[in-house]
Amino acid sequence: MSTEEQKEEIKDISSKQENSSEVPKAEEAGKVVESQKDTTSEEKKEETTEKKEDDGKKDLSFDEAEVLKQVEFYFSDTNLPHDKFLWTTSQKNDGWVPIQTIANFKRMRRFQPLEAIVNALRKSPELLEVDEAGEKVRRMIPLVRVDNKSVMERSVYCKGFGDEKDDTQIALEKFFEENAGPISAVRMRRDDDKKFKGSVFVEFKEPDVANKFLEKVKTAPLKWGEDELTIMSKKEYVDMKAELHKNDPPKFSSKRRRFDAFKEMDRQRPGKYSNRGRKFKKQRSSNASEEKPSAASE
């Protein structure tokens, strides 16, 4: 073998040794990269878990005043007579309703824990009472039949709220409390398919609050976002709609009649409807005998 050939062979051997030594280096480098990826992945998972836990803590907010306000609304003269589920539940047990049942209501789920809700309800000045075990709540004051005329005088119609969002009801209540004053209820108006119409009836606690609000918006119109609201008294709205549709043919709505606890109590009152029913049947029987055609005329 010539000297040149020997040099070439030595060079090839050296090159192969270098390449073979680079393979484990590359493999080692790959392992390091994979290890870094795994570490980064684990860190991201931990961050995501922590974020979810933080988000969960944020959702489980608690405000005693807000809890008490919401539950007192459920048992108020404005709501209870028309809340069929709550009324029926309360009538099964001398007015008592399980606090856990109320805690499961959509507006109440964000308030935790249950013990804190119980403590908040115990601070009701006069409307509510909690049993000794802290398991049930009921209304202490007798239910008052609200005069429809009084409700009309305290109510306002507002339109221009756009599409409904998850927090629209809460946002509307805060909006009117901040811009007008104490409210009894904000009723979101819906069509036959239960879609929000973008308008509401606001029932204030006092007629003066409603009147001052109507005077205020005459010179300082209110906006919801970028849209100016249409605002008038409920009576004005009802009269306007009646005039607009006075010549229309009768319209039959698929909506169910609103539940009325007072009518239910009237039905259960002994003698109130039973006597009336007997008189009605007797009168119908008498009229039927008078109007029944004779055999000859048939």
UniProtKB/Swiss-Prot annotation:
Pfam families: La, RRM_1. GO terms for cellular component: cytoplasm; nucleus; ribonucleoprotein complex. Residues 275-284 have a biased composition (Basic residues). RNA chaperone that binds to tRNA precursors and promotes their folding and maturation. Also able to bind misfolded tRNAs. Acts as a regulator of tRNA methylation: binding to nascent pre-tRNAs inhibits the activity of tRNA (guanine(26)-N(2))-dimethyltransferase trm1. InterPro entries: La_dom_prot (IPR045180), La_HTH (IPR006630), Lupus_La (IPR002344), Nucleotide-bd_a/b_plait_sf (IPR012677), RBD_domain_sf (IPR035979), RRM_dom (IPR000504), WH-like_DNA-bd_sf (IPR036388), WH_DNA-bd_sf (IPR036390). Residues 1-15, 24-60, 259-269, 289-298 have a biased composition (Basic and acidic residues). Residues 1-60, 242-298 are annotated as: Disordered. Keywords: Nucleus, Phosphoprotein, RNA-binding. GO terms for molecular function: mRNA binding; RNA folding chaperone; tRNA binding. The gene is sla1. It is found in: Nucleus. The modification Phosphoserine is found at residues 61, 124. Residues 57-148 form the HTH La-type RNA-binding domain. One of its GO terms (biological process) is tRNA processing. It comes from the Eukaryota. This is La protein homolog. Gene3D superfamilies: 3.30.70.330, Winged helix-like DNA-binding domain superfamily/Winged helix DNA-binding domain. Residues 154-236 form the RRM domain.
